[in-house]
Amino acid sequence: MIYTCTMNTAVDLFVETDELLPDVVNRTKDEDYQPNGKGVNISFMLKRLGLDNTALGFTGGFTGRFIENELLNEKIVTDFVEVEGISRINIFINSTREFKIVNKGPLISEARKQELINKIRQIPPGRFLFISGSLPRGVPDDMYLSLSEIAAENKLKLILDISSPVLLDCLSYHPYLIKPNEQELAAFFSRKKALSEEEIIHCGKELLDRGAERVLISRGKDGALYLDRQRTLKATAAKGKVVNTACAGDAMLAVFVGKQELGCSVPEALRHASAAGSLTAFSKGLGDVSKLDQTASQIQITHL
């Protein structure tokens, strides 16, 4: 069984309009509501690959019920901690440019935080645990450290996709895999300019030296890089019209891990992972897994 943990679940509202103007009523051409949060996205993608998983985290209010119902509709097991308030609503506007409006999330009490910690302590050894995304109000960054320590103690395969600089401290617990994007990677190492490919690889190797077992770096239109202690691989991206980049990294991560669980080699899993990221970028929500093989045929893998 695979477990995902999303501490700041969300409902994402995707809207499309010809243009977005100030001080007037902007009418949309299309709208779509999607259950979201990085771990939630990963749960959907894993299930669509045929992999059972359990979704953990915090949910609240009518939005929380929507998120949980959508997961249950796809036969995904849920074990959320219900909190006061409502799970946040984020807005993504596709106009002449892409706009992203992301809210903070509900305030989490100490009791509810401890309840989630206790659920994670009960995960059997050897299982995958994805900890992904931001933290809601009331949950300090050291929560990532606490959960990383529990994962190490319980011999879980910990996968981290977080933008907090605390990630660097979590590396001492030797996570199975981490997935920064280029911007996060630059921020972790206090680089103010965009990184060259050579610099990205250097930073990725530094993360390995600090304790990560594997590093997957999502690069948008430039595909992805994968590093472990034996190899460095580069994947291109597929070509298409970008609609929404919000969930592409989540799809990439889920498919990279999921395909290996289904027996694929690392290079083949990376090929499909890059395809999943591209398909999602070309969609309003998560990419269609039925198109994975066809899209993966466009992806080139290079050993660096």
Swiss-Prot record:
Its cofactor is Mg(2+). Transmembrane segments: none annotated. GO terms for cellular component: cytosol. Its EC number is 2.7.1.234. One of its GO terms (molecular function) is ATP binding. It holds the Pfam family PfkB. Keywords: ATP-binding, Carbohydrate metabolism, Kinase, Magnesium, Nucleotide-binding, Transferase. Activity is inhibited by tagatose-6-phosphate and fructose-6-phosphate. Pathway: Carbohydrate degradation. It catalyses: alpha-D-tagatopyranose 1-phosphate + ATP = D-tagatofuranose 1,6-bisphosphate + ADP + H(+). The keyword Ribonucleoprotein does not apply. The active site is at 250 (proton acceptor). Belongs to the carbohydrate kinase PfkB family. Kinase involved in a D-tagatose catabolic pathway. Catalyzes the phosphorylation of D-tagatose-1-phosphate (Tag-1P) to D-tagatose-1,6-bisphosphate. Can also use D-fructose-1-phosphate, with 40-fold lower catalytic efficiency, but not tagatose-6-phosphate or fructose-6-phosphate. PANTHER family: 1-PHOSPHOFRUCTOKINASE, 1-PHOSPHOFRUCTOKINASE-RELATED. This is D-tagatose-1-phosphate kinase. It comes from Bacillus licheniformis (strain ATCC 14580 / DSM 13 / JCM 2505 / CCUG 7422 / NBRC 12200 / NCIMB 9375 / NCTC 10341 / NRRL NRS-1264 / Gibson 46). The lineage of its organism: Bacteria, Bacillati, Bacillota, Bacilli, Bacillales.
